[in-house]
UniProtKB/Swiss-Prot annotation:
Protein name: Alcohol dehydrogenase 2
Manner of cofactor binding, per the entry note: Binds 2 Zn(2+) ions per subunit.
CDD domains: CAD3 (cd08297)
Localization of this protein: Cytoplasm
Residues that coordinate or bind Zn(2+) 1: C44, H67, C154
Function noted in UniProt: Converts ethanol to acetaldehyde.
Amino acid sequence: MSIPTTQKAVIFETNGGPLLYKDIPVPKPKPNELLINVKYSGVCHTDLHAWKGDWPLDTKLPLVGGHEGAGVVVALGENVTGWEIGDYAGIKWINGSCLQCEYCVTAHESNCPDADLSGYTHDGSFQQYATADAIQAARIPKGTDLALIAPILCAGITVYKALKTAQLQAGQWVAVSGAAGGLGSLAIQYAKAMGYRVVGIDGGADKGEFAKSLGAEVFVDFLSSKDVVADVLKATNGGAHGVINVSVSERAMQQSVDYVRPTGTVVLVGLPAGAKVSASVFSSVVRTIQIKGSYVGNRADSAEAIDFFTRGLIKCPIKIVGLSELASVYELMEQGKILGRYVVDTSK
């Protein structure tokens, strides 16, 4: 298979600096890596944070962002087994991990202190050819629509793992805060597929219609609601058994502590820069609530999330634009104007 020496990519040299759509060299895979011809990549809020550099974790610079890349394997490192040229593969947030530390050996690879992060510490999927550790790369069944599955590789895996973290039972209520965004739109669908009842929370009538079209039974509009907490408590007859916070609003996260049901679980997923959540010790103990963080997922979570998609249970509401338009997608993201998920076509 012919592999070019240069490719189109979006790269930035300083945090917050110009997003340059330009030719850069095609990377060569290390002995343990795949070289993947990325066809499509989802665009995530994490990519925005990586560009801005506003998280307490340094990025590599210069950097090619992106960590929801779906494509075709075009080259194998000399030590790679179990993959073939032409296989479909996905680039996830966890590009690689040590596989030897206490976290890796207990299936918590995302907590590995030496984890290599796509589009953050490792050049990611906003390029036509990208490398990924062969063990961590996601296996995608051949024939899959690569544009539609791209958001599953981070957003889907992340919300699926968060729902597992909430430890709910079929028929129980789960509130999805940030319901109309890229993660929220998938969280609603995974929750329905897992047998849960969904309260979607977001701002705007259009977002309410969108959330309900995906399966939300109830929608609470924080723009028109006089009391979000009271509305959720009423809709769920006592509070949500679980809350999936994919919103990037600190206030929304704080409210979730108050509308979660006694014995329920608040799951924190979204990562607004500098945000904090406080909880009354007395109330937390007496109501027996749990507040947990959930950070992407392991290899098993990834395979399970992809399986839900390939069985037709999850529909990714996407809009496809060219990779060259990435800067405008970031602008829309900052303005909170995105329904579902934007996906970039690396050929444009």
